[in-house]
Design a protein with these regions (language model features):
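Conserved ABC ATPase "signature" region
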Residues: 100, 104-127
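Conserved ABC transporter NBD signature motif
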Residues: 60-71, 75-76
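Catalytic Walker B motif of ABC-type/P-loop ATPase nucleotide-binding domains
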Residues: 156-159
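Conserved catalytic motifs of ABC-family nucleotide-binding domains
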Residues: 152
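ABC transporter nucleotide-binding domain
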Residues: 174-264
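Short, charged/small-residue-rich alpha-helical element at the C-terminal edge
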Residues: 229-303, 307
Length: 307
């Protein structure tokens, strides 16, 4: 699948000497949903701002749809719709007016049918004549998405799109994102709701301290770095784990009534069969068991905490 965004050796250094981005290399594939994850201050918004032409790069090269963002800035920017983290809207303009105006900024001809479709898809149609100042935070966020889609971009950046949005509106918003993907739009999102990234993304990138530390297909990532946890609920309380079970690195619950065993999802052998046998030999019986698997959030936390 061809790359629609190509980022090569990208760096950003501020006047103070702070390096916000350090030799970032990244390829975004056409038509995918790409989740860019990282802690606060990791460089997510800086990276997005450079690709969208809002901030200047210090070194490196970025192309969007084959257009260099510096030498062919207009052509590159026209392909992009951006929903920024901060809410910037004309408070006293109507929803219809501000979305239509955004389309005009890209020299697109008027297209009331397209504006209507966008507003309906985002459940904003009944608010089309309302002034933005009267809307809730979640509805204002939807207006920002409508503005970003007004000129029919091929790429949509969503920087924390569900911040301040209630659960019901959030679900509806992700339905719109799925429909956009189905229509061929490439979507790059950042979110603190990592469960959403786990559900929505095709690929995941993790950025920390200005460096891309991982880019992986989501399914492969979950398989390669995910762990499974087996929890055994004991019939009788134990004070300590017997020495004969040390090799399993079991965790004993505070009340002494459960042990937890972590095993690798990609391993040829899980070790569970031998564990159960050794537990029996140690005179430990269990009444119930359950298993859980690492979430994307668990993997993310382990990656950014790594030295």
């Amino acid at each position: 699948m061809p790359s629609i965004i190509s980022i090569s050796d990208l760096s950003k250094t501020y006047g103070s000497g702070f390096k916000a981005l350090k030799d970032v290399n990244l390829e975004i594939e056409k038509g995918e949903i790409f989740a860019l994850l990282g802690p606060n201050g990791a460089g997510k918004t800086t990276l997005i701002s450079i690709v969208c032409g809002i901030a200047n790069l210090s070194a490196g090269r970025v192309t969007v749809g084959g257009h260099d963002i510096i030498t062919e800035a207009t052509a590159a920017r026209t392909l992009i719709g951006l929903v920024p983290q901060e809410l910037h809207t004309d408070a006293f303009e109507t929803v219809w007016g501000t979305v239509s105006f955004s389309r005009g900024l890209f020299n697109k001809p008027k297209n009331p049918a397209h504006i209507e479709k966008v507003l309906r898809d985002l459940s904003l149609w009944d608010k089309k004549d309302s002034k933005i100042v009267t809307l809730s935070g979640g509805m204002k966020r939807r207006v920002m998405i409508a503005k970003a889609l007004s000129h029919e971009p091929q790429i949509l950046f969503l920087d924390e799109p569900t911040a301040g949005v209630d659960v019901e509106l959030r679900k509806g918003m992700w339905e719109v994102v799925r429909d956009l993907k189905a229509s061929g739009v490439t979507i790059i999102l950042t979110t603190h709701y990592i469960g959403e990234a786990e559900e929505m993304a095709d690929r995941v990138g993790v950025i920390n301290k200005g460096e891309i530390i991982l880019v992986e297909d989501k399914a492969n990532l979950m398989q390669k770095l995910g762990k499974k946890e087996l929890k055994l609920h004991l019939q009788a309380k134990i004070e300590t784990i017997p020495d004969s079970l040390t090799a399993y690195n079991l965790e004993l619950s505070d009340d002494g009534r459960a042990v937890t065993y972590n095993y690798d999802t990609k391993g040829d052998r899980t070790g569970i069969t031998s564990l159960l046998s050794d537990l029996r030999n140690a005179g430990i019986r269990f009444s119930d068991l359950d298993t859980t698997q690492s979430s994307l959030e668990d993997i993310f936390v382990s990656l950014v905490r790594a030295p």
